[in-house]
Each structure stands twice: as structure tokens, then as C-alpha cells.
UniProtKB/Swiss-Prot annotation:
Residue positions, PTM N6-acetyllysine: 45, 525
Taxonomic source organism: Rattus norvegicus (Rat)
GO biological process: carboxylic acid catabolic process; long-chain fatty acid metabolic process; medium-chain fatty acid metabolic process; mitochondrial respiratory chain complex I assembly
Domain of life: Eukaryota
Protein's name according to its UniProt entry: Complex I assembly factor ACAD9, mitochondrial
EC code: 1.3.8.-
CDD domains: VLCAD
Length: 625
């Protein structure tokens, strides 16, 4: 099938198809490097030290005019396909994506968006991948199917596969002839990936591994030809002892011994294929080890960390469509002889949805822009923050939209209840938001701990100079010192109309850095067990990154004269003010003796409930005698 034959109905469609085909040729003629290794320091990690690293963040990343023109030409036919060819209601009701729809997705090249051109893919940058994700998000089941295939299913081959593995597997995966799945989760191991029980045993002749075990909730599990599978293997440690360590494998269905259960009947994303996958004496050649034997945990984390940023642009695309649909309803629906749009509580909901969409979009494209830079930084924390913020905002905004729509939002005749069902999974997959908050906080604290080790040792030992310096800092802070981290005082970095918000960001970052030092001094290594503390640290950091993203983006929009940049100023300032006060409250909660800190009460209440495994308060109608 020709790549764009689906658009060839009539002269206009034919012209669109021709334009899109030219774009595709340009894409495949130009080589784009897909970065696969981490190099320079993360922007987010520096926030833990009270620093704002401007490089790569200010000004907001831009794509070239040529790239922008190309991607915009590609966007048109893709939007046309999703608007006219994809029946999301049917996909949801029937619980599967029709074969002809899958075929058209393949013909569009959507199964190889980030596969390098030399292996038959489009080789698009992270930013272009994010832009296409906005459109693909028009259908959640398709979004999940494509993401499971390339963001995690085949991503390991791109990141750590050797040349032979890439040449063998990527061409058919990029064309969609083969579909990929990522097999990590097991019945007894969800977030605790290291506890998997699937085992791969090396054969006596050392030519292959024998794979046995079961994986659950595998997206594309019933469709896939190629699986990235994680299993325990015996590894000889440096001291000569034998230990079980996780190893990643490329497994073909044709290797045999692979079966899958029936598709799961799910709450949302019902058209995606999710099922159990079982491996029974599956013989995997040693050449199909992905990365190093025993290095599977690192491979899994690199795969998951690399793609999370795209959830921000995908959810933003969904929310923009949702705002458009609900705004039309609010402006035409009358109650009390007035349009719904005239009521303050309805207006508040639209402001919230617009703000959330703007922030997540800014965070996603800031992250993709950093990833696309030469010598790009480690953006694993940033990508995780985008995922947490956008998934929670999606759930909140769709819920608010249903509130605007009233009964209509609850009916299956309209798409809104489906959007609510589809949104719920976002908080769970690609790492639950609880686990990601721990990852965000602990990764940054580990970085700060390495930098501050000597200072913390001096404070613990009572070094007079260090102690007096710390007391002096706290005294200056208590007197309301002016914080200048190079944003609010430099109009070349942040536009003056955003100056007050920039100052709020600087102040938050400064005191966050101080608080991090205090937490490391107070808890030391035991901080890994302080999940309520870590949650607050992560929440502050997510807000700081969101503030940074909107200030950088809005400043760029003002300077280059983008339309409606005054609207961006409103959204950016509104978010920064709200985030600033949220951060102040969270910072106060991190003080063990502050009245805002209810950690001990929270732990005691939950302990009493879980001991009885029940709600233990007496019924309000009960009597003591």
C-alpha cells in the first residue's frame, strides 16, 4: 500500500497526499541523530542545590523554520486521517482497532516515528515525535498501541541494541510488519521490577537461554511478533559468587513456547490489546541478549525514562480538543436565561483547563527540546515530572469538563465519558505516579548528597566555621533577603511582564535548596524510607519545573510576537502565583515541628485502619450503652 493512498479521494485529498509524500521523502533524506546516551548534568538536579541552570532552558528551545514547515505539512494529512477515518466510538465498543485502521497507521509510517532512517523509520526528533503525539492522542487506544510498540516495545533495540540486532529487527518493526511489546510486569511484581520471577537459564552448550515465566497486562501482547522480555539470570559476581540478576532479551514469537491469554476487558483504552503472555521453555539465542547479561534493570529503566515526556504533548492535544468542545457547549447552553459561559464557576473551570494544558505543553516541549540538543542532558527527572503533571491534570480536567456538560457528559452518546475512562490509566502506567514521585525526589537528593557530602559531615561534626556560616545564612533568610538567581534581574532572560513570577521562582528555588540540605542533614540515608517527605520534595520540584517552562515559553512568545501572547502571560503568571504558594506550604510541611506537618497523625490513622483492615469509627447512631 502506498504511504498516503488513504488521502487520495478527490483533487484536494490528492494534493494533500502529494505534499505529505514530499515531506516523507525529505524526512527520509535528512539524517537525524537519535541520542541514546546521557551526558551533561540535568537542569532538575541543579534545582536541588538551589541553582537555576539557564543553558538549554532560556531561551525556550526552537525548531528551525524548515523543520517547522515540514512537520506542519505532515500534520495536515494526519489530522485529516484521525478526524475522518478513525471511529473512536466503534473502537471503544468493539474493544479492538480495526485491521484497516492499523494498516493505514502503518502506511503513514507511525510505527517507526523515531526509528532511524537507515532502518526504515522516519527518524524524527523528540520534538517532532511530541508534535505528532498531539494528533495521535485523538484516539487513546491508538495512542497506547503505538506507544507500547515504539516508546517501550522496540526502544531497547534503539538504545542498547548492537548493529546486528538493529539491522535484523528494526526495518520490519518500523514498517509495522512486526509489532513490538514490552514484557516486564508480572503477577507478583508491579512497581517492584527487581522482584520478577521469570527465569532464563543458559543451555549446556551456551548457545541459547531457556525462558520460562508469565507476564501480565502486556499492551500489544496478543498482537506482537517481537517482545522485549526481562528475566532473572544467573550471573557470576566479581567475588566469584553466583547471583540472580535481571537480563533483557529480544524474543520472537516464532521461537515457540509463547502463548497469550484473551484480551483483558478494561475500564478504558478498550481498543488496545492487553493480555497475559506466557513463556514455556522458549529458546532464545544468546545473540538476542539486549545489552549485557545482568544489565536488564538498567535497560528497563532507560527505556521507561526515555519516553515519558511525550505524555505531556499527547494530553495537551487531548485537552485542547476538549476545551474546544466544552466551550462550544458552554457558549450555547442556557440556564437561568444566561449562557453557561457567563457564570463565574464555569469560567473558573475553563481557566483551569487552559492553564493545565499550557503548563504541560510547555514542560513537554522544553524537555523534548533539551533532549534534541547536542550533548543533551540527562532528562529522566524532567520526563518523569512531565508524566506526573500531565496525567493528573488530564484526570482533573476531564472531570471538570464533565461537570460543565452535566448529564450530557455522562452519556455514552458523547465522547466525554470515554475520555474520562481513558484518562484514568495515565496515572498508573509507565510507572505509577507514586513511584515516579519517589524517583524524582530520590534521584535529585542523591545528586545533592554527592555535592554536599563534605559540608554535611562538617555540620554533623560541629565544625565551627560551617555551623556559623549556616546560622548566618538562616538569619539573613529570616530577615527576608533578596534572592537573585539571574532571571528577574535580566530582561534578556525573562520578559519584564513576567518579572514578578520570575522572582517567585527564584525565591522558591533558593529556599528549596536550603531545605534539601536540611533534609539530608536530618535524615541522611534513611530518607529513602520517608515517603511523605519525598512526595513533598517531588511536588515542589514539579512546580518549579512547570514555572520555569512557562516563563521561558511565554518570554519567547512575547519577544517574537506570537499571536495571543498576552493570553500566555496571563496563564504563566497565574500558574506561577499558585505554584509559589503551594511550594511555600510544602516547604513549611517539611519542617518536622511546623503545625502544617501532620505526618505522625497520617501514619497513626493508617496504621489503626490497616491493623483492623477496616474503617474503625463507631457508627454515628451507635450508643455507648
Amino acid at each position: 500500500m502506498s504511504g498516503y493512498v488513504l488521502f487520495s479521494r478527490g483533487a484536494t485529498a490528492a494534493a494533500a497526499a502529494a505534499r505529505a509524500s514530499r515531506v516523507l521523502r525529505v524526512f527520509t533524506e535528512r539524517r537525524r541523530t537519535l541520542h541514546t546516551s546521557l551526558q551533561s548534568c540535568s537542569f532538575a538536579k541543579e534545582l536541588f542545590l538551589g541553582h537555576i541552570q539557564q543553558k538549554g532552558v532560556f531561551p525556550f528551545p526552537e525548531v528551525s523554520q524548515e523543520e517547522l514547515s515540514e512537520i506542519n505539512q505532515f500534520v495536515g494529512p494526519l489530522e485529516k486521517f484521525f478526524n475522518e477515518e478513525v471511529d473512536s466510538r466503534k473502537i471503544d465498543q468493539e474493544g479492538k482497532i480495526p485491521a484497516d485502521t492499523l494498516a493505514k497507521l502503518k502506511s503513514l509510517g507511525l510505527f517507526g516515528i523515531q526509528v532511524p532512517e537507515e532502518y526504515g523509520g522516519l527518524g524524527l526528533s523528540n520534538t517532532m515525535y511530541a508534535r505528532l503525539g498531539e494528533i495521535i492522542s485523538m484516539d487513546a487506544s491508538i495512542t497506547v498501541t503505538l506507544a507500547a510498540h515504539q516508546a517501550i516495545g522496540l526502544k531497547g533495540i534503539i538504545l542498547v541494541g548492537n548493529e546486528e540486532q538493529k539491522a535484523k529487527y528494526l526495518p520490519k518493526l518500523s514498517s509495522g510488519e512486526h509489532i513490538a511489546a514490552f514484557c516486564l510486569t508480572e503477577p507478583a511484581s508491579g512497581s517492584d521490577a527487581a522482584s520478577i520471577q521469570t527465569r532464563a537459564t543458559l543451555s549446556e552448550d551456551k548457545k541459547y537461554f531457556v525462558l520460562n515465566g508469565s507476564k501480565v497486562w502486556i499492551t500489544n501482547g496478543g498482537l506482537a511478533n517481537i517482545f522485549t522480555v526481562f528475566a532473572k539470570t544467573e550471573v557470576v559476581d566479581s567475588d566469584g559468587s553466583i547471583k540472580d540478576k535481571m537480563t533483557a532479551f529480544i524474543v520472537e514469537r516464532d521461537f515457540g513456547g509463547i502463548t497469550n491469554g484473551k484480551p483483558e476487558d478494561k475500564l478504558g483504552i478498550r481498543g488496545s490489546n492487553t493480555c497475559e503472555v506466557h513463556f514455556e521453555n522458549t529458546r532464545v539465542p544468546v545473540e538476542n541478549v539486549l545489552g549485557e547479561v545482568g544489565g536488564g534493570f538498567k535497560v528497563a529503566m532507560n527505556i521507561l525514562n526515555s519516553g515519558r515526556f511525550s505524555m505531556g504533548s499527547a494530553v495537551a492535544g487531548m485537552l485542547k480538543k476538549l476545551i474546544e468542545q466544552t466551550a462550544e457547549y458552554a457558549c450555547t447552553r442556557k440556564q437561568f436565561n444566561r449562557n453557561l459561559s457567563e457564570f463565574g464557576l464555569i469560567q473558573e473551570k475553563f481557566a483551569l483547563m487552559a492553564q493545565k494544558a499550557y503548563v504541560m505543553e510547555s514542560m513537554a516541549y522544553l524537555t523534548s527540546g533539551m533532549l534534541d540538543q547536542p550533548g543533551f542532558p540527562d532528562c529522566s527527572i524532567e520526563a518523569a515530572m512531565v508524566k506526573v503533571f500531565s496525567s493528573e491534570a488530564a484526570w482533573q480536567c476531564v472531570s471538570e469538563a464533565l461537570q460543565i456538560l452535566g448529564g450530557s457528559g455522562y452519556m455514552k452518546d458523547y465522547p466525554y465519558e470515554r475520555m474520562l475512562r481513558d484518562a484514568r490509566i495515565l496515572l498508573i502506567f509507565e510507572g505509577t505516579n507514586e513511584i515516579l514521585r519517589l524517583f524524582i525526589a530520590l534521584t535529585g537528593l542523591q545528586h545533592a548528597g554527592r555535592i554536599l557530602t563534605s559540608r554535611i559531615k562538617e555540620l554533623k561534626s560541629g565544625n565551627v566555621t560551617t555551623v556559623m556560616e549556616t546560622i548566618g545564612r538562616k538569619l539573613r533568610d529570616s530577615l527576608g533577603r533578596t534572592v537573585d538567581l539571574g532571571l528577574s534581574s535580566n530582561i534578556a532572560v525573562v520578559h519584564p511582564s513576567l518579572g514578578d513570577s520570575a522572582n517567585k521562582l527564584e525565591e522558591n528555588v533558593h529556599y528549596f535548596g536550603r531545605t534539601v540540605e536540611t533534609l539530608l542533614l536530618r535524615f541522611g540515608k534513611t530518607i529513602v524510607e520517608e515517603q511523605l517527605v519525598l512526595k513533598r520534595v517531588a511536588n515542589i520540584l514539579i512546580n518549579l519545573y512547570g514555572m520555569t517552562a512557562v516563563l521561558s515559553r511565554a518570554s519567547r512568545s512575547i519577544r517574537i510576537g506570537l499571536k495571543n501572547h498576552d493570553h500566555e502571560i496571563l496563564l504563566a503568571n497565574m500558574f506561577c502565583v499558585e505554584a509559589y504558594f503551594q511550594n511555600l506550604f510544602s516547604l513549611s510541611q517539611l519542617d518536622k515541628y511546623a503545625p502544617e506537618n501532620l505526618d505522625e497523625q497520617i501514619k497513626k490513622v493508617s496504621q489503626q485502619i490497616l491493623e483492623k483492615r477496616a474503617y474503625i469509627c463507631a457508627h454515628p447512631l451507635d450508643r455507648a450503652s
